[in-house]
Structure formats: structure tokens, C-alpha cells
Design a protein with these regions (language model features):
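Phosphate-binding chemistry for phosphorylated carbohydrates and sugar-nucleotides
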Residues: 1-148, 161
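Catalytic-core signal marking the mid-to-C-terminal active-site face
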Residues: 150-255
Length: 255
């Protein structure tokens, strides 16, 4: 139904959309969703992809700073820990849960939640429904741009003043099931003290393994429960450094 590709609103699936924005020269922001519109993909005026971590931070900054909303922030384990830094800045409670929006929705139904978000682009906010809505998130970002009179890039720079500049990248390793299982066992047994030059400082294991390095960068490894795929996530101060972490991880994991 999607010409043979997964309908995930990420940059590799949205190349024609990015090209359209670049070629037009007069598009301030581009909004994309998946097939049922619960996940959001966002582009700036230069056709550069804005990932879900940045969208979550933008939404929190707008809802608290401009709309004076309150409430807890609940995010999936794969979301950047910089969200915690923003929550501390605004005095908000912060909770990390397992991956899967059902873990967020349950809390939204029973507690006062400002925002719930996933790395996949599924985000819900207060005042709407306790479920992901990519179109509503995009409209909220556009409202932020209109009311502030600022570009998306300018608003992202305001976020960076609070949490610092960062880039996030993800790679999927398609492996034989037995190889995937062996890597998972190594993670369970704490067999990775470093990934190439990146020395592990601490590990979090809420849903998968998130390895933090001494400079604050991190790598997350999580096996898919439905297919022979290992998902690797990395965050650093530049795109190049994030990709370097992913490359070092792949080399270490495959031995």
C-alpha cells in the first residue's frame, strides 16, 4: 500500500518531500505523517529533517513557556534524556517508561500529564486526546511559529539554550535470529564495557540497553520483538559523531 516501503515518517522515506521543500524556496515548515497520521515527521525551511526528540522539546517549551501548561512529562526509553533537563528547567515531573504508547496512554488517563512521547514520532499533549496525533502535533508547532513570529530553526535554538545542541541518529541491523539473540545475551551479561573508543560510564535497562559514555553521549541497543532486527540509537553533539558511535557499535556487536 506504500509502494513497498514502511510508512514511517523518517527522512529516508521522505526524500521527495524534502526535495520539494528545497526546490520551492518559500516553504517555512513541512509536516509529514505515517499512514494513519499518528506519527509526525517535520522539516525546516531548508529541507532538513527535525526528529521527534526536537519536536518533543519544542512542544514542551511552547506549552509551558507560552501557554502556561503544567503536568508531568512521560517519555519512552528511547527518547533523549535531554527532555529530563528541560523538565528540571521548568520544574516538571519526568517519567521514563517502556517502549509502546500503551505505557504512556495509561498514565495520561490516570494522572496530570503535559506530554507523552516516543522516538518513533508518536506524541500526545494535554488538552487533546491521550493518543498519538501527528497532525495535531504539527499544527501545534505551526501555531508556535505563527504566535512567536520565529522560524523553526530559531525556536530550536531557544531549546538548545536550555538543553544544549545535539543530533540523534538510528540504524537498524538486519541479522540472523541467532546472531540477534547472541548480542542480546551479551548485553544482558554486561559484556560491553566499551564500543571502540567509547568507554561505557553507566547503563540503563528499562527497555533495552542505553549505554552512557563519559562525555554525555549515549548509545541504545534494543532488539525487535517481531523481526530479526537490532535497533541502535545514538546521540552526540553532531550528526557525524552520532554516526561514528553507530559505526563503532556495529563493529563491536558483530565482533
Amino acid at each position: 500500500g506504500f509502494e513497498g516501503q514502511a510508512p514511517e515518517p523518517i527522512h529516508k522515506n521522505l526524500q521527495p518531500f524534502a526535495s520539494l521543500i528545497i526546490e520551492s524556496g518559500d516553504i517555512d515548515c513541512g509536516l509529514a505523517t505515517d499512514g494513519d497520521a499518528d506519527r509526525i515527521g517535520l522539516y525546516n525551511s531548508k529541507g532538513e529533517f527535525v526528529d521527534s526528540h526536537h519536536i518533543i522539546l519544542l512542544l514542551i517549551n511552547y506549552l509551558v513557556k507560552e501557554k502556561k501548561f503544567t503536568g508531568k512529562v512521560v517519555n519512552a526509553f528511547s527518547v533523549t534524556p535531554r527532555v529530563k533537563k528541560m523538565c528540571e528547567f521548568y520544574g516538571l515531573d519526568y517519567q521514563v517508561v517502556k517502549i509502546g504508547f500503551k505505557h504512556i496512554a495509561g498514565i495520561m488517563l490516570s494522572e496530570d500529564v503535559l506530554l507523552g512521547g516516543e522516538e518513533s514520532g508518536g506524541i500526545a499533549i494535554k488538552g487533546h486526546i491521550p493518543e498519538r496525533d501527528g497532525i495535531w502535533m504539527g499544527l501545534t508547532i505551526w501555531e508556535y511559529m505563527v504566535k512567536s513570529g520565529k522560524s523553526l530553526d530559531d525556536l530550536i535554538q531557544e531549546v538548545y539554550k536550555i538543553v544544549g545542541e545535539f543530533k540523534f541518529e538510528r540504524s537498524d541491523m538486519h541479522l540472523k535470529e541467532e546472531v540477534k539473540v547472541a548480542i542480546v545475551e551479551n548485553c544482558k551479561n554486561n559484556n560491553y564495557s566499551s564500543f571502540g573508543p567509547y568507554k561505557v560510564d553507566r547503563v540503563e535497562t528499562i527497555d533495552g540497553w542505553k549505554y552512557f559514555f563519559d562525555n554525555g553521549d549515549w548509545l541504545m541497543i534494543r532488539a525487535s520483538g517481531t523481526e530479526p532486527v537490532l535497533r541502535n540509537y545514538a546521540e552526540s553533539e553532531t550528526t557525524e559523531k552520532a554516526f561514528a558511535i553507530l559505526k563503532a557499535a556495529e563493529k563491536a556487536l558483530l565482533g
